[in-house]
């Protein structure tokens, strides 16, 4: 990034674990194998090395929460680790508006939306969600925009098996923005561990692969 002299960098989540990976609230029978391995990793083994290198970049740098940031800590702890004030936000750069979303919420047994927290989300399949307040905020951001828009998220923003459970609410909002002449140009996510290009309503949705590739 330094050599290419890019205008900014952003990581799209599942980027770093906290230093201590010994505490997880997920029931053992629901726990995926990668969490079990992480829990066995000694605290003294560096886990923030890549994050520290990322933060050395001399130009603007931005973070986004993935689900795995909350495997061994609360969402508040994950935000603190990345120096983020809020889990979703927007920024402007060189005539573009960039929107960063947070899809790390699930519905509990009472039907309430709950933040991912110490791996507890692995006990349910009713996920992921954008919260109602976030959707209201996003609608205001889109309808007040005067610049072309790029949306970043961890989970896909189009209908697919690993995408948002309330993707219809999001897509309705996007269609409303497009009908109002708002220039939503591009949406980018990861989470799926594959490279995917998806076109819908004139918008390119790009899923970025992971270093570990598909598994």
Q: What do these predicted ranges mean?
A:
Residues 13-14, 66-67, 154, 190-191:
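Active-site glycine-centered loops adjacent to acidic/histidine catalytic or metal-binding residues
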Residues 11-15, 140-160:
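Short acidic, glycine-rich surface-loop motifs adjacent to enzyme active sites
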Residues 1-11, 16-22:
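N-terminal carbohydrate-binding/catalytic regions of secreted carbohydrate-active enzymes
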Residues 9-11, 63, 151, 188:
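Residue-level marker for buried hydrophobic side chains located in beta-strands
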Residues 21-144, 169-185, 194-214:
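Extended active-site neighborhood of metal-dependent phosphoesterases/phosphodiesterases
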Residues 151-156, 187-195:
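Histidine-centered catalytic micro-motifs
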């Amino acid at each position: 990034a330094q050599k290419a002299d890019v205008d900014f960098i952003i990581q799209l989540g599942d980027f770093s674990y906290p230093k201590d990976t010994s505490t997880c609230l997920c029931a053992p029978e629901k726990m995926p194998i990668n969490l079990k391995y992480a829990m066995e990793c000694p605290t003294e083994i560096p886990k923030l090395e890549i994050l520290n290198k990322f933060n050395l970049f001399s130009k603007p740098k931005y973070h986004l929460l993935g689900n795995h940031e909350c495997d061994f800590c609360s969402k508040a702890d994950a935000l603190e680790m990345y120096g983020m004030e809020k889990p979703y936000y927007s920024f402007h750069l060189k005539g573009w508006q960039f929107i960063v979303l947070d899809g790390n919420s699930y519905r509990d047994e009472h039907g309430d939306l709950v933040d991912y927290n110490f791996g507890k989300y692995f006990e349910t399949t009713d996920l992921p969600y954008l919260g109602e307040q976030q959707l209201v905020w996003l609608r205001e951001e889109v309808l007040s925009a005067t610049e072309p828009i790029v949306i970043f998220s961890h989970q896909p923003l189009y209908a697919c098996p690993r995408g948002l459970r309330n993707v219809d609410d999001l897509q309705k909002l996007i269609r409303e923005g497009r009908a109002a002449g708002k220039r939503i140009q591009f949406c980018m996510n990861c989470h799926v561990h594959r490279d995917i290009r998806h076109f819908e309503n004139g918008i390119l949705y790009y899923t970025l692969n992971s270093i570990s590739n598909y598994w």
